[in-house]
């Protein structure tokens, strides 16, 4: 078999017939820059800046500097993340042996072309779809595709799907499907429509932005009309008031903060060899209630070892016999365990060998005229494992039991039993304990015997290990499946479709993450809210996942969860500071339209409050440790702070306007009072958010407070306010004192309303259950 010629290979490469799946793990620098520069809010802010320039009031376009700074930071963070991610190889040098022009050569998987002739031997991973041309006892493990652990004999013209592993024998096969057309990648495409890839936090923020965006244009137009045509203001005054109102409604800092915080999390994880392929993955992991995983590669490390021996014939030299039965060529986990224990020797005369096959369930070795059988007892003799009482403890533990026998088929003598166990990862117990402490339920979904998995969990002192079920026993009724899925801990002998159905059932009222590495995991990875692929897994499983553990180290998961919690909890904590401005700007704009009075702020005044009282402190607070479990109450928590404080700002302004109207005072003289009180209320919220105070938070709070008041005192002309005097200080002090009680009152009222709504929702839920 000569394979393809150089000319044939080049022809196929030039015609796009090479094994390139074109999966992009990061965006190009151009895409990163354009996506961060050309945004709805940047365009809107530039348009507003142009309007301000027409008034000649240059100091009122300082809000643009914030937008530029925000954009530069976002681009820098994403480019930094890209550099780190690009330096990590998701697929660790997968290679394949092909025959070209009669020579065997090893090439990277990306250089495989259609019709290539591939040489297969024991231990090889199948990276593309193949058709067998020649088989020498070729056996394939298709468990990553079918979930069945038994090896399948492959003969001429049989198909071997990508994701399979050659367990024994050798052969030649032709490449029939590559890249996106391979079985594994097709499965990814078929499953791609399953999942909504927007996270709770992103969805909530996007919904807020949609509402604001819808309101900005009509409110802005009406505000200008009111200011210019009805209030009798000049063009310049009307434009500045309108721009201030519109800018105030946009929580652009919240969008940037979310993006920067998530990207910083991605960078931190990448340094630990964890690739966050989709930004929302880190947030979803933080909210995870249920984690689904397989036994192999997570709890166990995929290797086995000999735990014990039960020798029936005390006269034999078990170690000598097994050392001569072992061969260097055998590479499956059981063979490696036997070789590690007994070694490989040639001290006895071996006259014949028949390799292990799935059909016979044993290997046969003829040593000095005597046949030795190594494998499953039921396939060697008429006896059963359960006939031997000394094996009962190992059967109950779910150990793999290998039988050594000798003689002719009709006169088999059982010599010994070798007890094999899975090697448990050193970090498994601590990792499982961590998730239990964090209130995350663990579900083991495996293709293995559920009893075996259950006993491994028992050895780790894992609660609920006895709650197991086989895939064939899963109920078909949807409601019953949800109940069983919630109550069961170990799911054994599961097919890919069954994995998907169980995860779908678990998602009914929970956030579910799943760890997988095989083609048979793809549907489950896609169905889960967050798919986590092991670095040693097939490429298709990686591309179907949000997160890739490049070192396949299960113990890094707590770090990912903690990082996600830090990001989400901190964003939730500071988001209300951005939405105060949105709240009072929207209310003030509507009141200005209805009551036809001038808008009380200039853009530069809002820029001062936004940068000193909100932007700077929120940026630092967002990077603090915060590992408490994430609750899905973003809207409730955020608006509990934003609404009372925002409404209080509006009440302050209304009182000042009424005071000026009743006592015939010039409103311009009292802008200082409005700006100072708004800054005070925002700083008061910052103080609330910083609790409990530590040294760092105290420094931050003092710095922001001093900076805000110092700028107003030193640069009143820049911020278009009057200087502090006795009247303004008294006014600010009195209203500031009253504000504290107003905010507390509105917060109590808010809590009562939320409690009523929750009670109403719970009643409806109970009624729906009964129905």
Per-region residue spans from a language model:
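Actuator/coupling domain of P-type ATPases
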Residues: 2-28, 69-72, 80-83, 87-91, ...
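Transmembrane helix-loop-helix hairpins at the membrane interface
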Residues: 19-97, 104, 338
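Hydrophobic alpha-helical transmembrane segments
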Residues: 55, 59-93, 100, 198-290, ...
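Cytosolic catalytic headpieces and adjacent flexible linkers of membrane translocases
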Residues: 221, 225, 363-385, 390-505, ...
């Amino acid at each position: 078999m000569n394979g393809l010629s150089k000319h044939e290979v080049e022809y196929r490469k030039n015609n796009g017939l090479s094994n390139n799946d074109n999966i992009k793990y990061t965006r190009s620098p151009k895409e990163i820059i354009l996506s961060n520069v050309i945004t709805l809010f940047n365009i809107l802010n530039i348009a507003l800046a142009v309007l301000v320039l027409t008034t000649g009031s240059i100091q009122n376009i300082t809000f643009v500097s914030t937008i530029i700074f925000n954009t530069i930071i976002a681009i820098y963070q994403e480019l930094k993340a890209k550099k780190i991610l690009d330096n990590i190889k998701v697929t660790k040098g997968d290679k394949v042996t092909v025959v070209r022009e009669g020579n065997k050569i090893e090439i990277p998987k990306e250089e495989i072309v259609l019709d290539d002739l591939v040489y297969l031997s024991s231990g090889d991973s199948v990276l593309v779809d193949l058709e067998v041309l020649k088989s020498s006892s070729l056996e394939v493990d298709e468990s990553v595709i079918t979930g069945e652990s038994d090896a399948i004999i492959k003969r001429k013209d049989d198909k071997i799907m990508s994701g399979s592993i050659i367990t024994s024998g050798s052969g030649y096969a032709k490449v029939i499907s590559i890249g996106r057309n391979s079985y594994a990648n097709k499965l990814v495409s078929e499953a791609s429509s399953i999942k909504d890839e927007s996270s709770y936090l992103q969805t909530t923020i996007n919904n807020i932005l949609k509402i604001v965006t819808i309101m900005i244009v009509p409110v802005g137009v009406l505000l200008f009309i009111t200011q210019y045509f009805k209030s009798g203001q000049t063009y310049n005054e009307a434009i500045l008031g309108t721009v201030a109102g519109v800018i105030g409604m946009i929580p652009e800092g919240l969008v940037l903060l979310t993006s920067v915080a998530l990207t910083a999390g991605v960078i931190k994880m990448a340094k630990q060899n964890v690739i966050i392929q989709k930004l929302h993955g880190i947030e979803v992991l933080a909210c995870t209630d249920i984690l689904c995983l397989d036994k192999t590669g997570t709890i166990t490390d995929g290797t086995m070892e000999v735990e014990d021996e039960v020798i029936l014939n005390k006269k034999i030299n078990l170690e000598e016999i097994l050392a001569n039965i072992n061969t260097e060529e055998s590479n499956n986990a059981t063979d490696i365990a036997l070789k590690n224990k007994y070694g490989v020797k040639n001290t006895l005369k071996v006259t014949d060998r028949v390799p292990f096959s799935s059909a016979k369930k044993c290997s046969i070795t003829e040593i000095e005229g005597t046949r030795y059988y190594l494998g499953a007892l039921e396939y060697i003799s008429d006896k059963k494992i359960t006939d031997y009482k000394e094996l009962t403890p190992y059967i109950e533990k779910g150990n793999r039991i290998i039988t050594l026998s000798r003689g002719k088929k009709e006169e088999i003598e059982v010599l010994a039993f070798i007890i094999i166990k899975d090697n448990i990862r050193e970090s498994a117990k601590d990792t499982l304990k961590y998730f239990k402490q964090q209130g995350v339920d663990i579900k083991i979904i495996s293709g293995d015997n559920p009893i075996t998995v259950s006993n491994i969990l028992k050895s780790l002192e894992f609660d609920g290990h006895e709650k197991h079920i086989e895939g064939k026993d899963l109920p078909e009724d949807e409601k019953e499946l949800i109940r069983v899925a919630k109550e069961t801990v170990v799911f054994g002998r599961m097919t890919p479709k069954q994995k998907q159905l169980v995860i779908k059932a678990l998602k009914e009222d929970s956030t579910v993450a799943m760890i997988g590495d095989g083609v048979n995991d793809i549907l489950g990875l896609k169905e889960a809210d967050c798919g986590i692929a092991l670095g040693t897994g097939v490429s298709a499983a990686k591309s179907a996942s949000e997160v890739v553990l490049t070192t396949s180290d299960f113990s890094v998961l707590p770090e990912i969860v903690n990082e996600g919690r830090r990001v989400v909890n901190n964003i939730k904590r500071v988001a209300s500071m951005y939405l105060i401005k949105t709240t009072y700007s929207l209310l003030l704009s509507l009141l200005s339209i209805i009551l036809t009075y001038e808008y009380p702020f200039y853009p530069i005044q809002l820029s001062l409050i936004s940068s000193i009282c909100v932007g700077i402190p929120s940026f630092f607070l967002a990077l603090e440790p915060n590992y408490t479990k994430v609750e899905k109450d973003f809207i409730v928590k955020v608006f509990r702070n934003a609404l009372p404080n925002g409404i209080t700002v509006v009440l302050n302004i209304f009182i000042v306007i009424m005071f000026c109207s009743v006592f015939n005072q010039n409103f311009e003289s009292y802008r200082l009072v409005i700006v100072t009180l708004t800054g005070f209320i925002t700083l008061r919220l910052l103080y609330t958010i910083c609790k409990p105070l530590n040294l760092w938070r105290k420094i931050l709070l003092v710095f922001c407070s001093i900076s805000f008041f110092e700028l107003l005192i030193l640069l009143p002309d820049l911020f278009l306010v009057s200087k502090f005097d006795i009247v303004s200080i008294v006014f600010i002090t009195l209203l500031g004192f009253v504000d504290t009680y107003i905010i507390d009152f509105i917060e109590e009222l808010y809590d009562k309303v939320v409690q009523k709504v929750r009670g109403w929702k719970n009643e409806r839920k109970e009624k729906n259950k009964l129905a």
